[in-house]
Design a protein with these regions (language model features):
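Binuclear metal-dependent phosphoesterase catalytic core
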Residues: 61-77, 187-252
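Conserved small/polar residues in nucleotide/adenosyl-binding loops
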Residues: 273-277
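Short coil/turn segments at beta-strand junctions that form active-site/ligand-binding loops
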Residues: 19, 76, 122-125, 252-260
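Conserved beta-sheet core of the metallophosphoesterase superfamily
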Residues: 42, 48, 134-212
């Protein structure tokens, strides 16, 4: 997977000389390892933010969470808030009777935005990138590849993303969706299914065009499903005998063979095959 990751960055930046890439760590990533080769990746116009750096006195290095993005003419057009998944200790401590995690995350985004707003020039937009679960976001009930916290202890209010931010691109939730109905705050979702719970999702990416400090066009681009996903049975698990009959009746596929999820219901030990060997 690491070989594919680095090879992709090399190829896509080599084939697109003005392309810049910004990557932030998610909750499943080794943040320090992801950021370790940063000097080499920067030579390929790729910025990675895995950890929240702090000074010796404990102050957050907000400059490290800021990435300047240039247009084809080489002019800075976007100031990017590149914020990785925030763990305990990454965000400011906020006195609150509510959710300390959510309030701390909100405060980090607020302080970072204040710095960028003072720094931005005319016709420059602010873009935010984050990896978190927003309150009200929709996940698949049986999708165990998405980590949720009981009671919503790590759910962040969409109010953390000010209207001063032209577009907010969020990760963590695999299903594409607007956050609280806001057109410019979205989960693009995963470009491919991450589990069989997502076999009915429409996967893709979001293409955003900026001009004059605003996101002037937001368009969803669907990704083709290269390998189909099938579940047998399509509904709830069934006995081994029923499952075997369904498998026998499956049609011969043309092209890529599907990934198959077989759901077998066993309410007691079951011996299906014996061998004299």
């Amino acid at each position: 997977s690491q070989s594919l990751y680095y090879h992709f960055i090399y190829r896509v930046t080599a084939e697109n000389p003005t392309l810049q890439i910004v990557i932030v760590a998610g909750n499943h990533d080794s943040a320090a390892r992801l950021e370790a080769p940063l000097p080499l990746l920067q030579a390929m116009r790729t910025e990675v933010r895995g950890v929240v750096r702090k000074s010796d006195d404990g102050e957050i290095d907000y400059d490290h969470l800021t990435v300047e993005l240039k247009n084809r003419d080489g002019e800075v057009e976007l100031l990017c808030m590149a914020v990785p998944f925030l763990r305990q200790g990454d965000y400011p401590t906020v006195p609150t009777e509510g959710n300390p995690y959510a309030e701390g995350v909100r405060e980090l985004y607020t302080q970072l935005l204040q710095r960028l707003w003072k720094r931005r020039k005319e016709n420059q937009s602010i873009l935010a990138i984050g990896h978190l679960q927003a309150i009200g976001s929709e996940i698949a009930e049986k999708d165990y590849s998405e980590r949720t916290v009981i009671g919503g202890l790590e759910c962040v209010s969409p109010d953390a993303f000010s209207e001063q931010i032209a577009y907010t691109a969020l990760g963590h939730i695999h299903k594409a969706q607007r956050v609280s109905g806001r057109e410019n705050v979205r989960y693009a979702g995963s470009p491919i299914p991450m589990s069989f719970a997502e076999k009915h999702y429409h996967h893709g990416v979001v293409e955003v065009t900026f001009d004059g400090g605003c996101a002037v066009d937001i368009m969803r681009v669907e990704c083709p499903r290269l390998i189909p996903l099938m579940s047998v049975p399509n509904g709830e698990p069934a006995s081994p005998e029923i499952v075997l009959e369904i498998l026998k009746e499956l049609p011969v596929t043309e092209g890529a063979e599907p990934y198959l999820e077989v759901k077998v219901l066993l309410d007691e030990p079951c011996l299906l095959y014996t061998s004299d060997a």
